[in-house]
């Protein structure tokens, strides 16, 4: 009986409690599984509301505004898994994580518009400077896509004036006539583990799925003032997948004299892109590494200058540079695996296209060279070219492996330099290209060292209209024409190369070229070891030429004379004892078969000073007026023979005579 009375007394309280729960839970029950929740750092719910699947923006924006109020510190906004239409852009807030795991948001704007944006004047009434619009924000998971029939040419995500932003594991799908995501004026912004897939009605000229853009108000980033020249810094794109697109990630447009700094594009996968996977324009301190690029039109493009075409370049309105012309890129493109082929957007595929130059047209006048860029450890398979560089200065291209898989008729080059000087091309492997290595158009003073070129379909190494090029310690085998071919080029040094089984000559000089060769090993060529055509000048020292079908070498002048290298001589030195010196030193040397003359040089002092020519003799003895007592006379001697512009010279013989006081 007492229990019954207790139950009757408490019944109204129980009923009130359950009624309260029913009322509070009614909205959630009406939209079961379709809600947005804001929790603070302690996990306490600060906002919860239903989201209409046909118009999710009002509820989502209210949640984001709750965070933006700043009343609850750093928050997490969670959306219940499901598919939602966004008829208006939602403005992101600082100090939050937006968790979209299992969520699909569809861009259903009636006109131009995005799904998510950083704060801007249109939505908040404020102008933002620097990186002040959005800070400490993470977007996690989810899929951003377009509603059926939405072809308005808008991005899915647009960020500007932002700092410490991460987009992690989000899929961006099915863009038409725009970019999937766009970023300008960002600092420490990261896209990681994201998917970019599906793109139509765009062209190679303007179609990066993820565009790292400039903050320019008229053509590239409208509606995000202030336009204060803030550039991107420390942008990271890592472990993302780009597939079935026009282009992948990067930048085409530039402010003259301002630079995107510290961009890292690492460990991404690019496949089936019609255009370029990675586009870098005005990048400094950039790292492009460990990406896998498959079945794309072009792998990596790196621009420091573009006079015309697809790049927009902006100045201060009077044609002046906004900042200053950078002289040091300080960037590297390393350890990428690249496979390129002809596509609808790229009829001349290349693994890499590196471009600087002297500005004309819309760029303020000056030289915008690609200076101090390292390209190393890349593997390139191509139906077109490998690496093409224009106006590269003091760059290193090393340890790259380039293989051509296209038709034999294609005129392709493994590493091609235009107007580029002072670069090191080292330890690259080029296989089955028209030319393996080529310097042309005033590409002066480059060093081509320790490369391997095999199965070239023309000359393996070409030097055209370029002076002072050094080709040293390379291995060249089984090419269709020449191992090393020079045309209208001066003062080349071709040293210690191994050249085997070329279809024509091991080394060929043409059209007034001049070169010094030394210690090359040339064998098995179907014509000559070395061919020096009319009007050229060649000095050859210690080359070893064997088994070449038509002979060791030929000087193609009026007599078309064959020449052979000549062997070493031996110069006898010694010591003149105290009191025996009479002001003269008698020198003698061993005669060399085939030598027509001997040239003697002397340096006064054992370690310093220049060697100066003393005499040219046909005999094997000479009496020299030597230095004063207490000095050392250091001598060098070479044997020579000359034939139609070819000077065959023996290795240097050395001797030192110590004159006692």
Language-model segments: what does each one mean?
Residues 42-80:
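Acidic Gly/Asp/Thr-rich repetitive segments characteristic of extracellular carbohydrate-active
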Residues 60-69, 85-94, 108, 127-129, ...:
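Short, T/G/N/S-enriched strand-turn elements that build extracellular solenoid repeat scaffolds
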Residues 72-114, 120-122, 144, 172:
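N-terminal extracellular ligand-recognition/capping segment immediately after the signal peptide
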Residues 85-89, 107-113, 147-155, 176-183, ...:
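Short glycine/acidic-rich loop motifs that flank beta-strands on beta-rich extracellular proteins
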Residues 127-272, 277:
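Right-handed parallel beta-helix
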Residues 564-594, 629, 646-661:
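Pro/Thr/Ser/Gly-rich low-complexity, intrinsically disordered linker/stalk tracts
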Residues 624-645:
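Beta-strand-rich modules
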């Amino acid at each position: 009986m007492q229990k019954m009375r207790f139950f009757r007394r408490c019944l109204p309280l129980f009923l009130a409690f359950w009624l309260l729960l029913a009322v509070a839970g009614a909205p959630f029950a009406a939209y079961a599984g379709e809600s947005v929740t804001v929790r603070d750092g302690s996990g306490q719910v600060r906002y919860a509301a239903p989201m209409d699947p046909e118009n999710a923006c009002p509820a989502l924006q209210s949640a984001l505004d709750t965070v933006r109020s700043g009343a609850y510190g750093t928050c997490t906004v969670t959306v219940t898994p499901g598919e939602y239409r966004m008829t208006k852009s939602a403005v992101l807030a600082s100090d939050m994580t937006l968790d979209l795991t299992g969520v699909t948001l569809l861009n259903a704007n009636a006109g131009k518009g995005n799904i998510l944006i950083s704060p801007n004047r249109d939505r908040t009434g404020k102008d933002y400077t620097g990186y002040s619009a959005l800070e400490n924000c993470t977007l996690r998971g989810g899929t951003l896509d377009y509603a059926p029939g939405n072809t308005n040419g808008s991005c899915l995500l647009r960020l500007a004036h932002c700092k410490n932003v991460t987009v992690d594991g989000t899929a961006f799908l099915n863009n038409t006539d725009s970019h999937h995501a766009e970023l300008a004026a960002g600092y420490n912004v990261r896209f990681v583990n994201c998917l970019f897939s599906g793109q139509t009605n765009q062209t190679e000229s303007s179609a990066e799925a993820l565009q790292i853009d400039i903050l320019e108000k008229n053509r590239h980033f409208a509606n995000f003032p202030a336009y204060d020249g803030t550039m991107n810094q420390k942008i990271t794109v890592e472990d993302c997948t780009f597939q079935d697109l026009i282009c992948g990630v990067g930048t085409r447009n530039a402010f003259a004299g301002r630079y995107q700094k510290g961009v890292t594009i690492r460990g991404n996968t690019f496949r089936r892109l019609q255009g370029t996977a990675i586009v870098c324009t005005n990048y400094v301190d950039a790292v492009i590494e460990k990406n896998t690029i498959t079945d794309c039109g072009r792998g990596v493009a790196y621009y420091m200058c573009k006079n015309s075409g697809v790049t927009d370049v902006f100045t201060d309105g009077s044609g002046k540079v906004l900042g200053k012309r950078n002289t040091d890129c300080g960037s590297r493109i390393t350890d990428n695996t690249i496979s390129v082929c002809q596509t609808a957007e790229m009829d001349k595929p290349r693994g890499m296209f590196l471009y600087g130059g002297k500005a004309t047209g819309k760029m303020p006048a000056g030289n915008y060279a690609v200076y101090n860029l390292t390209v190393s450890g890349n593997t390139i398979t191509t139906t077109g070219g490998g690496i093409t560089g224009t106006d590269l200065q003091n760059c290193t291209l090393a340890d790259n492996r380039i293989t051509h898989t296209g038709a034999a008729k294609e005129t392709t080059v493994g590493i091609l330099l235009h107007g580029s000087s002072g670069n090191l091309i080292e330890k690259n492997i080029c296989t089955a290209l028209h030319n393996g290595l080529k310097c042309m158009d005033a590409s002066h003073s480059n060093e081509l060292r320790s490369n391997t070129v095999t199965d070239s379909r023309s000359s393996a190494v070409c030097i055209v209209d370029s002076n002072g090029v050094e080709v040293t310690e390379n291995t060249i085998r089984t090419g269709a024409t020449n191992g090393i071919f020079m045309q209208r080029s001066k003062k080349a040094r071709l040293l210690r190369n191994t050249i085997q089984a070329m279809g024509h000559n091991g080394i060929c000089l043409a059209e007034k070229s001049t070169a010094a060769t030394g210690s090359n090993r040339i064998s098995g060529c179907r014509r000559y070891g070395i061919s020096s055509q009319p009007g050229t000048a060649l000095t050859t020292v210690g080359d070893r030429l064997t088994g070449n079908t038509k002979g060791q070498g030929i000087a193609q002048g009026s007599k078309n004379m064959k020449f052979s290298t000549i062997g070493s001589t031996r110069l006898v030195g010694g010591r003149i004892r105290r009191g025996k010196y009479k002001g003269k030193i008698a020198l003698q040397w061993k005669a060399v078969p085939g030598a027509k003359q001997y040239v003697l040089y002397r340096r006064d002092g054992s370690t310093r000073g220049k060697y100066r020519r003393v005499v040219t003799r046909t005999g094997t003895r000479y009496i020299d007026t030597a230095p004063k007592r207490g000095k050392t006379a250091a001598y060098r001697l070479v044997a020579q023979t000359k034939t139609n512009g070819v000077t065959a010279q023996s290795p240097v013989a050395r001797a030192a005579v110590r004159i006692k006081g």
